[in-house]
Amino acid sequence: MSPTTTSLRSLSFSLYASSNSTPISTPIEARQLLSSCNRFYGLSSSSSSSSLTTSSLIGNLVFSSRNQSLSVKVQALAAETEQPKWWERKAGPNMIDITSAEQFLNALKDAGDRLVIVDFYGTWCGSCRAMFPKLCKTAKEHPNILFLKVNFDENKSLCKSLNVKVLPYFHFYRGADGQVESFSCSLAKFQKLREAIERHNVGSISNISSSASEKVEDSSE
């Protein structure tokens, strides 16, 4: 037999064997590749699997922690949004928000001889915000006095016509006397507002009792 014939038969047998052999499955190849990598890096399959599991757990914990933190922030923001803004809070029925010049004039007219205190404020005004809780307390102590709140930004034409140039600013009105006093005030000078109330709310029973309580409060401060 010639070498050429032997070579052709060997090639034919090799091709036949190749076409009829069962291919190695992909999972087996993957496992073999992973095993080779582990041997190269000196790791066992179990330690590699353990490392992957630990990494997954840590990743899940971090993701869960971030989700919880985000959830808390969202809940806090929602609670803050639901609460009224500081300027939206009212001390009682004797504190009214003014939204127009017409409403302002009608409120003064309907008050009769009742003392009316107008608070001109801005939502952005830090001094207005600082003294507002004390103003609300004063309104509760004087239910006979009508307090009107005027938002400067929403009633600019009204404020301009009344010559309001600084905030917070107060106007005092009483019956036929009209405007009896006006001044700027702050938390540090809140006593100025109390003294004006004593001057213009003369004869009121609630004024006498509240003045006594204010003196006690001042002596304790």
From Swiss-Prot:
Any Pfam family from its record, for instance, is Thioredoxin
A GO molecular-function annotation: oxidoreductase activity, acting on a sulfur group of donors, disulfide as acceptor
Keyword Membrane appears in the UniProt entry: no
Which locations, inside or outside the cell, does it occupy? Answer: Plastid, Chloroplast stroma
The main location class comes to plastid
Q: Which GO terms describe its biological process?
A: detection of redox state; regulation of photosynthesis
Among its keywords, does the record have Transit peptide? yes
Q: Which GO terms describe its cellular component?
A: chloroplast; chloroplast stroma
What positions does the domain Thioredoxin occupy? Answer: 74-202
- Disulphide linkage map: 125-128
Q: Which residues does the Swiss-Prot or TrEMBL entry list as transit peptide?
A: 1-73
Q: Which residues catalyse the reaction?
A: 125, 128
Keyword annotations = Chloroplast, Disulfide bond, Electron transport, Plastid, Redox-active center, Transit peptide, Transport
Sequence similarity: Belongs to the thioredoxin family.
Q: What does this protein do?
A: Thiol-disulfide oxidoreductase that may participate in various redox reactions. Possesses insulin disulfide bonds reducing activity.
Q: What is this protein called?
A: Thioredoxin-like 2-1, chloroplastic
Organism encoding this protein: Arabidopsis thaliana
